């Protein structure tokens, strides 16, 4: 029989001070509004992009939706950096959200690559392919943040 090692102690997502700052700042509400709004725009845009790719129709609508999604992504990244500064004392790469921030830069890079493709007149298929790659990374990144939200809720329940 193998000896078992004790489980590593659970590292809480927020200290009490960080939780208090998180709960007190308006940037938490801003993120709470922007995140579902961005997801809604993503879902609509994904449908428009897929429609365009399937039918060849609706390029302008798909393009407009990708531009709106990209604007929201940039906005949530800036406001999220401000939120991290308020809560953790640094604009990005706070230990609690390090990997989410790293992956966010990949998401931003792909959205920016889409803008490059659009503004340099690359073929529409390439533009939409880049948009789909950006959207795939966005879904993974959103999942990372949803996981952290779940962890924070579990931490709160354990603290009560």
Curated annotation (Swiss-Prot):
UniProt keyword annotation of Lyase present: yes
The EC class name is lyase
One Gene Ontology term from the biological process aspect of the record: photosynthesis, dark reaction
Q: What are the EC numbers?
A: 4.2.1.-
Q: Which terms in the Gene Ontology molecular function aspect does this entry carry?
A: hydro-lyase activity
**What keywords would UniProt list here?**
Bacteriochlorophyll biosynthesis, Chlorophyll biosynthesis, Lyase, Photosynthesis
Q: Which InterPro entries match?
A: BCHF
Pathway assignment reads: Porphyrin-containing compound metabolism; bacteriochlorophyll biosynthesis (light-independent)
Which NCBIfam families does its entry note? BchF (TIGR02020)
Q: What is this protein called?
A: 2-vinyl bacteriochlorophyllide hydratase
The species is Cereibacter sphaeroides (strain ATCC 17023 / DSM 158 / JCM 6121 / CCUG 31486 / LMG 2827 / NBRC 12203 / NCIMB 8253 / ATH 2.4.1.)
